[in-house]
Amino acid sequence: MTTPFDPSAFLSTCSGRPGVYRMFDSEARLLYVGKAKNLKNRLASYFRKSGLAPKTAALVARIAQVETTITANETEALLLEQTLIKEWRPPYNILLRDDKSYPYVFLSDGNFPRLSIHRGAKKQKGKYFGPYPSAGAIRESLSLLQKTFFVRQCEDSFYKNRTRPCLQYQIKRCKAPCVGLVDPAEYAEDVRHSVMFLEGRSNALTDELSGAMEQAASTLDFERAAELRDQISLLRRVQDQQSMEGGTGDVDVIAAFVNPGGACVHLISVRGGRVLGSKNFFPQTGIDEEVAEVMAAFLGQYYVSSPERDLPSELIVNVVHEDFPTLIEAIHELRGRELDISHRVRGTRARWQQLAVTNAEQALGARLANRQHVAARFDALAEVLNLDEPPQRLECYDISHSSGEATVASCVVFGPEGPIKSDYRRYNIEGVTAGDDYAAMHQALTRRFSKLKDGEGKLPDILLVDGGKGQLSMARDVLNELAVPDLILLGVAKGATRKAGFETLYLNDSAHEFTLKGDSPALHLIQQIRDEAHRFAITGHRARRGKTRRTSTLEGVAGVGPTRRRDLLKHFGGLQELSRASIDEIAKAPGISKKLAELIYANLHSE
């Protein structure tokens, strides 16, 4: 029998020095990680007899063990705390869900450099601009640059193997340097202008282009003057959209907003005085957190736990926290750079701050409204199915293939708050007759529910199958074979017209058939989940089919493994170009001998 946790005995031996504490439940699962200037005083606040917030009380009720680590100072405690949170992601901590690296615009080296999106380590030679807060923001900038300055964005392998201009040249998005249709000096000038834009020097760029336009007009080069006029027009349109532009500094404007339903942190990224975009974060909040606690947790995880992330010279925030000096010191220790955190600001910076607050508030409101909308649909489904309470987990399965090729099954999961994307799964189907959807579904469900015996995964309340009586019957057979506990089975078959709103539903067995009105919230939920499963299956199938078609003809060649196959395709710019190459041309590729080139050629041209 486990000995109950004794707070008094624990506190009597607890140190009053700075450090980190870790709270565990009776099964030794980490519940919460915190830091303190005085460990004893901080931990004592959890075990007072009254005045605890409900979520804090729920945490304390689960505590079976507390461990502490004494540190030399608060800065060391903060660094250790962030390391532990990132590694263990305790359920009662505020957790930043999106930990992906941010994208940059990358300009490669060379005579005709390329603009592209880059994530991760900066290993390639060239210039990096950013970071941008989202892929959408960076694609918008690249699209503008392509329309304005025509710098190529194609892969190097594609560029090196062109024999005639591609479609981008035809629609005036590129000057075709691949086939020598642009003078190197002219291209270099376009690259220089692109760099000026990416560095935030839009005003200087516009002035330079205006001067060039006047000069072209004075020499009667009206075609060149018209081209420059169009470039200036595009740039001024962007400048009008970026009303927040000002100064030349690098600033992140961050606002946190909290209400009983959750929290949102909105970040506006300004680099070189130019707004690159913004992004919403919805941290998983643990115990009842004040807005300042959410802000401190966000800054710690965003800038301290991810030292590879770009660091501006200043943060403008809407709330202050007593840990900010410690945070600044920790960042200086990690990166050797100074950081200013500003709260009371004026003028343009105050407008930035207020805009971030407004965005955070509106984003959280929209998220909660959508959550309530989804929850209402779950309530409606429970009513339709005569359930005592709304289901908490729905799984839907679908199959996608092209005439039996590259068959993929999808599993999507929804809860009362919407899709649970971390639980989505795809299954590559093997060993079944091409086009046999029943066998494919049987394999997918067998693989999914076999894992329950090993304690993996969660049992859904409702299992949706995109199909009619046959698919539903097959799903029931799989569950019976695996002795899966009773759960609700729901088959969704398209009506005779195959239009949304005319679906036929089958509950548990094919004998229980019914339909719902087109405006039924329950039907809308079923359609939403079904369509998401369909989308997830199709994207998986297309990726698998594309990979198969690119590589299958090379997979049987001895001496051509995955790495060499990838290098070959990259060298020639694709399988089609490789198929056109002669034996001598193939032999010139890195790592390919004459004998291996003959084998590759024979394989590509066999009947």
From Swiss-Prot:
InterPro entries: GIY-YIG_endonuc, GIY-YIG_endonuc_sf, GIY-YIG_UvrC_Cho, Hlx-hairpin-Hlx_DNA-bd_motif, RuvA_2-like, UVR_dom, UVR_dom_sf, UvrABC_protein_C. Keywords: Cytoplasm, DNA damage, DNA excision, DNA repair, Excision nuclease, SOS response. SUPFAM superfamilies: C-terminal UvrC-binding domain of UvrB, GIY-YIG endonuclease, RuvA domain 2-like. GO terms for biological process: nucleotide-excision repair; SOS response. This is UvrABC system protein C. Gene3D superfamilies: 5' to 3' exonuclease, C-terminal subdomain (1.10.150.20), GIY-YIG endonuclease (3.40.1440.10), UVR domain (4.10.860.10), UvrC, RNAse H endonuclease domain (3.30.420.340). NCBIfam families: PRK00558.1-5 (NF001824), uvrC (TIGR00194). It comes from Pseudomonas fluorescens (strain SBW25). The lineage of its organism: Bacteria, Pseudomonadati, Pseudomonadota, Gammaproteobacteria, Pseudomonadales. Residues 203-238 form the UVR domain. Interacts with UvrB in an incision complex.
